[in-house]
Amino acid sequence: TSGKGLDVSGFYGQRFNKVGTTIFASYNRNWVYDPSDTGFTAIPQFDRYVFNPKLFLYLTEHTQISIGLNAMFEDRLGGDIEYIKGKGDDTHSYFEKNKTQRHSTQLTFGHRFNEKDRLDFKNSVTYFKRNIGVPSYSFEGVQVSTFSELSYTHTNQKTEWVAGLNLWTDKFDENKLTDFQPRDYNQTILGAFVQNNWEATEWLNLETGLRTDYVPDYGTAILPRVSAHFKITDNFSSRLGGGFGYKTPTIFTEDSERLQYQHVLPIDKDKNKLERSYGLNIDFNYVTSFCDGNITFSINQLFFYTYLDNPLLLQSTTDGLYRLNNITGHTDSKGGETNVKIGYKDF
């Protein structure tokens, strides 16, 4: 690549009657890169290996199972160029080392009872180990998280109903390298949801949903959402949507990562609370073609607004430490995005 990088990947897929498989593997490397000659890395040096095999079992015409594994190993080193080149001294001594392992399993089960009814189960388990090092400080920890979902789908001519249950778990154990307070945590979230897709008319489709999550120590979150798709002409359409969301507090934020989590106090369940978000978006899409369909043109314009209540911010304390506090008030973000696409035949 132009940034002194190398990307190599391979893919294989095959089906043998009732058994199928796909295998994806990649290797990514970046050499130390300092295009402005500042003496510090603009892109750190790293090596990354990814391996992703999947197995598909077609048990019957109506029942399928898939099992997958995703493994990733990465070593990353940034900081002073001379240090990275092995020429470090008292002047050239700053570095940031990241050693990461992320492994996850994926399991899906689907069974169709008839043309209208279907049962699905999904499960994923993720193991994430990280070691961060800077001069005179190191952070190590292991995070194990799981996600499970059971859903039932019923389809009619113009409507589709989906109802289900969710279970999330998230456990973090810090490798205690100093006498600083441990930042270990263990979270479990139970959820139930129902959603409906309705083809109201030829020009209007409505998608509505309601999710309720119970988060121990933080209470219940009720999360409605709605989306309406308007087909104004054969070439011009629009979508209007909105919904609620939330995030549980953890020490893993962008601000705390910039400090390598050094001197960041653990989350206090008695003081912290859920960050709650409220969003609204609208987009307009125009599609046309020229030259007997050989040339296609599309443009999409998106506008969005997000309101975040009681945001979690990193604040310094009087004794030189840092605490993540839910501040009183809100932050909001708004903006737009334009995408233009021109295609020629299959390009």
Which residues does each predicted region cover?
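Transmembrane beta-strands of outer-membrane beta-barrel pores
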Residues: 1-2, 16-18, 27-31, 71-75, ...
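Outer-membrane beta-barrel translocator/receptor signature
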Residues: 1-36, 44-51, 62
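Hydrophobic, lipid-facing positions within transmembrane beta-strands of outer-membrane proteins
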Residues: 6-10, 49-53, 69, 101-107, ...
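Short loop/turn motifs that connect adjacent beta-strands in outer-membrane beta-barrel proteins
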Residues: 17-19, 61-64, 112-118, 155-160, ...
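Surface-exposed extracellular loop regions of Gram-negative outer-membrane beta-barrel proteins
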Residues: 18-35, 48, 118-133, 160-169, 171, 183, 216-221, 230, ...
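Membrane-embedded beta-barrel scaffold of Gram-negative outer-membrane proteins
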Residues: 19, 118-132, 231, 239, ...
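Flexible loop and strand-edge segments within Gram-negative outer membrane beta-barrel domains
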Residues: 30-49, 56-119, 125-143
